[in-house]
Curated annotation (Swiss-Prot):
Named cofactor requirement(s): Mg(2+); Mn(2+)
Species, as recorded: Trypanosoma brucei brucei
Subunit details: Oligomer. Component of the mitochondrial 3' processome (MPsome) complex composed at least of terminal uridylyltransferase KRET1/TUT1, 3'-5' exonuclease DSS1, MPSS1, MPSS2 and MPSS3. Within the complex, interacts with DSS1, MPSS1 and MPSS3.
EC primary class: transferase
Span list, region Important for catalytic activity and RNA binding: 700-976
Annotated binding of RNA, by residue: R358
Record-linked Pfam families: MTPAP-like_central, PAP_assoc
Protein name: Terminal uridylyltransferase 1
Enzyme Commission number(s): 2.7.7.52
Catalytic activity: RNA(n) + UTP = RNA(n)-3'-uridine ribonucleotide + diphosphate
Site (Important for catalytic activity): D473
Gene inactivation effect: RNAi-mediated knockdown at the procyclic stage causes severe growth defect and a severe reduction in mRNA editing. Reduced production of guided RNAs (gRNA) and rRNAs due to a block in the processing of gRNA and rRNA precursors. Accumulation of unprocessed precursors for some pre-edited and never-edited mRNAs.
Gene name of this polypeptide: KRET1
Biased composition (Acidic residues): 147-183
Amino acid sequence: MVSKYHRLLQQGLREEEEGVTERNMVAGGEQRHGHVDDDNAEGDADFYDQKDERRAKMWNPKHESANVSAGGKQNRSVRDCLPGSLPPVANTSTDAAVRFDRERKNAGHGVDISCVEGDGAQMGTYVSTGRSDAKAGGGSSAIGVTADDESDGNLDTDGSDASEGDEVESTTDADVYGEDDTTEGPRGGVRLYSCDACPHAVFTTHAALLAHAEEHHADLLPDHARLRRIAQKLNPVWNRALNARRNTITSWGKKIFHVAAQRDAGESKMQEAHRARAQLECVVRRWHDKARVFIFGSSVAMGVWDGTADIDFAVVDVDAMERGSWPPLEKNAVRSITELLRRVGFSFVNLEPISHARVPIIKHHASSPILTVARRDAEDVVARSIRFILNGPATREDRLLLEGSVRDAVGPTGVQQVWWNRTSDMMSATLESTTAAVRAAMCSPALASASLRTKVQPAHDECRPELYNIDFDLSFRAFGIRNSTLLRKYLLSHPCARPGAIVLKDWSKTSGVNNSVNGYFTSYAINIMWIYYLVQKGYVPYVDPLEIPESLVNYTDFDPRYTPMIDPEITNTEREELYKAAGDMLVGFFYFYSFEFDWGHNVISLNRPGITTKRMLGWHVEDVVPVASTSVSSGGGGSNVKRHPTRYELCIEDPYEENLNLGRHIGVTKSLRVRTELYRGLLSLLKEGETRSCVFAAADSSGTPAAGGKQSAALPARALFKLMALTTQAISESRRLPQSNSDNSGRIANGDNESLTEVGGGHRVEGAGVDPASCAGASLSSFGEPPIGVHEKTLESIFVEKAPMEFQLVRKVWNWHQLIHRLGYKIHRGHVMPRREVGVRCTARRDAEETTTELASGVDTTKSLRPGRGLTDTMLRDLSRGYMTLTPEWVAWSAPWVSQHLRGYSRLTTVRSAVADETPPALATVPSVVKPPTGEAVMGAMRTTRRNAAPARRVELLKLWLWRGISKVTPFKSPR
């Protein structure tokens, strides 16, 4: 490959020499003629300069400088800038100084532009170059200074701040960046610098690369020059600024701990992560019986889990890794485990296998966005229940075999309840734990009928095992386990280390610095930067990465131990000291990477206690991908695999993976943006009189409360459940409203054989009586608004008044119609009602018929006792109480929608005592459901079985109907 480029460069050099020879011959001919005037000679010179402009500009900084000042464009090609086509350069640093000298005045404009360097030059300060004059006849200087810069922070650009006692020192960009323009390449040639925004732009000097980035990609760096210049004014007076902003820095430290306290959801949340790991291991062991699941990532390094962040899992066979045969073929492993997860009820939409990445993983996005604070008893019962759905009715042998398969998977004592539906095509089971539920779901069901197929899923859409309700990433490499253990050892060595790491992670995500998809840093790299700063400043002791064993044979921390974010035993005095230290550490982080760290020569590394340079690791030479292999679609001569150049602009060494730069995708343009965000964060933390900073933008936008601590206990187990209860209560109350209080309700008055009836829209009908058949045949809508519905505006006002926090939470996820649908209702003519209210309508119509008949016959309805009277009201009220208390009676082992519980109403309530007093002896012998102290219903002789309640309820209704018919003929008076 080198010989190929060498031939191309020699050809380019010959073309250059031919152009120079031709130009000299023409110039010599003009001198011999002697009659060319000065204007024509100057014009010819400009013509030949323009002719050779492209070739000269690519390799000679002097030509480049002259061309930019003359207004020429820099259109470069890879061929013209590769090594070999360049003549020997005597002093490239001098050429760079001519192009980028900040003290050099612009002759065309007379503007004196200087930069205050102070101590930054000695500490490896990063300063990017401003744009030169783009046009020779332009009206303003273009070194990155604009008119609005003068008003930012009241900072001048004429060096007037030198009166503070700090010497104004001018340096060239080559000195500031610390780059050696004569660095040798991989095989003794000149080092190349490529642009990350232009795939075909390659340069031989770092100064030329910076000039190219600032001139052609200035739209990607809108604030870089301004923020850099303001931050440099702060550098010479750094100690004075810290003393002046002491109270502000302490307030930031207090906010750091408040933000960190919100991420600590307590030990119970960490135990949920432990159970999720055990459940995932049950699934993985169906694929590989010796595989173990490990937790790594932030939950291990921080020692806490907030319940919302994703969890990183690693599948490792420890014995195979010791033999050197792990990981397996990761693409096949991703497909196999994805299929197993989908088999146990994971959604195709929420489960995303990524098999073609550098590290193949499986990503899971939880379907329920409503967060859980505490799981109640009823939710726990439903969460450890699963459902087997068959494609046909099962015989007695099929039932026995399927139940036996479940018991064999979890043990004889692992199953608490098993019940079948009426059609024998669905079996549900409640296990002793959620982990046992997943283990039962992974069993191989045995069936006697060859045509039967089973599908297993959780018994509930919301209350499921912990693995279904968390976001997680599953990989097959053990690097993360060792890395997380190392980070945990560092972060637990100082009480301010973990809170600071959390704030910096939020800042990096909101600022765009933490965006690995677009080629920036990862959260792991940000943590390495934070720890490296703490080690260099002496906040935490150095830990040798080799102290963490590579082998996992003796590894026992499968479930990371919970460590509170804030020690509950610290005193108020100690807390104030921690606030002060945390603020100093956070501000010092931004100052360290803005001015002190030498990005040009050094590497952020935890492998050595001292300073690591790029030359020590061989990272001072950039790997430039040849043109033919930059893309798969570049032609038939390219490589079949797309390659990306490994860049060493910003270097972060991985502690364990050899020769891995965590910033390998960050080129010059992205590096300038990273440094811009560092400047921005530093200035926002030190700005006087401000209570908001871009560093805490994530906490401010999410509405983090000012006081630390866990989430409020006022938030119910799930926000949807409280809204369900309020909706059901509102519908029940609307049905119980007196008929006279509604404008559209019918009023019936009885007296002296005359009645006045006002129906619906106010039409009056007079007569000797009311025809019961006409009222009985009337539709429910003829009596005004639906008896079981509530108006949309009324329901919304109830939500805002009684559950504002829950209503605001769910509206961030769904719109109004989606929310009503999630609650199990529908909107009909502006009213909210259950989606399937056929049974309720029949009951309500029957009550209306009886009321009309009794009014027509002159019977006092207040004195008549009917067991079925008010059944709709009682049903809805009891159902709402079930939603509010979340008892197993209302759950009914199915989705928690109102429409699916109305037919099984006997599971929700028992016969009222008032009705029981008037019940005839024949009906009183019907056994009622006895509720044990544990809260679980006892059905039948065996506790492990439960018969369906719907047939029993139909028998009760049939007997009640017969008794009602008999009582109309011969009134029955029960003994008092």
